[in-house]
Amino acid sequence: MRFSRLLIPTTKETPNDATLASHIYLIRGGFIQSVGGSGLYNFLPLGKKVLDRVRNVVKEELDKAGCQEVSLSFVTPASLWEESGRYEKYGKELLRFKDRKNNEFVLGPTHEEMMVNLVRQSVKSYKQLPLNLYQINLKFRDEIRPRFGLMRGREFLMKDGYSFHTSEEDMKREFDLMEETYKKIFTRLGLEFRVVEADSGAIGGSGSKEFMVLADSGEDTIVVCDNCDYGANIEAAVRQEKDCEAKAPEAEAGKVHTPDTTTIESLSAFFDVDPYYLVKMVAKRALYDEGKSEVVLFALRGSDELQEVKACNAVNANDLADISEEELETAGLIAGYMGPTGVPEGVRVVLDNNLKDATSMICGANEKDHHLVGNSFEGMEGDYHDLVAVQEGDLCPKCGAPMRYTKGIEAGHIFQLGTQYSEPLGATFLDENGKAQPMVMGTYGIGVSRLLAAIIEQNHDDRGCIWTKESAPFDLQLIVSNIKDETQVALGEKLYEALTAKGLDVLFDDRKDRFGAKMKDYELLGIPYAVVIGKKLQDGLVEFISREGLVKEEVSAEAILDVVGERV
């Protein structure tokens, strides 16, 4: 393709709202164009080329794994979402609207309901299963604050796949196959990534894994062990149970006057004990469907922090909200002196697993200026869950080595759904005995347009993009330094024809612009390799450039085709 005929509106100006390298360079390089700053983007020719290349990698690996591609309607009847129970639960990110006949619809942010509807009409027997269907299609989520370009837009291209099985064992087999398939996809795209345990969120299900592209700019905090392969999103990370070498408090069970000790720090100082032996109480309002709510006290050791996603899941709430001191008083609670026993009626208590059988604990007495000492949880019944946010240095649950935080970009997510959608939507099959059974499901997603941003977040420098081989819009850029030099132009045309004949996708920069401007554009666009025909041609030399590191090498004009054949 000739540069002079392509729409590539490069610019030196950085968008005002752009902070991430991917957002800056994709706009400046003319790959994408913002539609009024609303989290919507047009893909220009170069961006569409990259998008198609990434899409093809995804499609090729899925097809090899036996998946079948379909295309579902972007507009979804609201009735399907009502059947699954997600119409209200999904929240304001679900864009709802009515047509001229007053029928209700949504713009699909995900397509579990639509795919189940397709399969329940088409599959009747166990002989038709297993089945893995996928699409690579547009999605829309009405994000409250779309930001970071393609990283968190409102409309995006997503691969979403859904598998249907006769048993949980067969679903888990497919889940493992999809994990390996996703690894192949991200490896082909040249990405450094980590597969981590994850929270299932609004999709639901009993188990899920995320594919995190490692990048300092990532929104997600992940916990990893460098000694083994354990990794987890902070929302789902677990650890080995903590011990404490500090001496336990030696006090007989009783109530102690503790004025002005409303924090863990002040309580620790008052009793001269490690926070490990204190009970921290975190009050939240749990929000449920149909406007229902309740006050919940989450109890954990004073040395730990509450992980709110875990806490929300523990009470099966849609969300957790902070509670003011006035609301606490209305519920009969006293800020700074709350405890897990003797709570007012109507207040729910959830205990962290690390409190099971704990002894010598100090907790609030649910009475102003008083705490209880010598508390024991041995044999105490209660609603126990993992509520703790794993900290750096906590020990790996698999191998016992210290873990650390790192940042990642969620580029893929796979779920074991079970019968969560098939049962309410009536997706059944007849088994060998002619009995109707609900289909067991898995679902598998990849943010295809987000991958463009993820690739650049991991592969860029201060001059522009550095596309990986499988994602690059072109294999090589051919640059004629001086378009007025007939010898340079003649060699450029000859090389362009020869390289194209070899099957390479070449961007031929035949513009009349200054050589410096052409090189700036090459560095910004980030095509993996370039051949520059310049002044050294009079000595029989051209320049071969690798975009990564901008490594330059002089090569004889006669040998350049062989060099390109070896390197590109």
Swiss-Prot record:
Recorded superkingdom: Bacteria
Protein name: Proline--tRNA ligase
Classification of source organism: Bacteria, Pseudomonadati, Campylobacterota, Epsilonproteobacteria, Campylobacterales
Key words, A-Z: Aminoacyl-tRNA synthetase, ATP-binding, Cytoplasm, Ligase, Nucleotide-binding, Protein biosynthesis
Job description of the protein: Catalyzes the attachment of proline to tRNA(Pro) in a two-step reaction: proline is first activated by ATP to form Pro-AMP and then transferred to the acceptor end of tRNA(Pro). As ProRS can inadvertently accommodate and process non-cognate amino acids such as alanine and cysteine, to avoid such errors it has two additional distinct editing activities against alanine. One activity is designated as 'pretransfer' editing and involves the tRNA(Pro)-independent hydrolysis of activated Ala-AMP.
UniProt source species: Sulfurovum sp. (strain NBC37-1)
Molecular function GO terms recorded: aminoacyl-tRNA deacylase activity; ATP binding; proline-tRNA ligase activity
Alphabetized PROSITE patterns for the sequence: AA_TRNA_LIGASE_II
Reactions that this protein is recorded to catalyse: tRNA(Pro) + L-proline + ATP = L-prolyl-tRNA(Pro) + AMP + diphosphate
Self-association state and partner proteins as the record states: Homodimer.
Comment, domains: Consists of three domains: the N-terminal catalytic domain, the editing domain and the C-terminal anticodon-binding domain.
Family under the similarity heading: Belongs to the class-II aminoacyl-tRNA synthetase family. ProS type 1 subfamily.
Keyword Transmembrane attributed: no
EC class name: ligase
CDD domains according to UniProt: ProRS-INS (cd04334), ProRS_anticodon_short (cd00861), ProRS_core_prok (cd00779)
Main subcellular location: cytoplasm
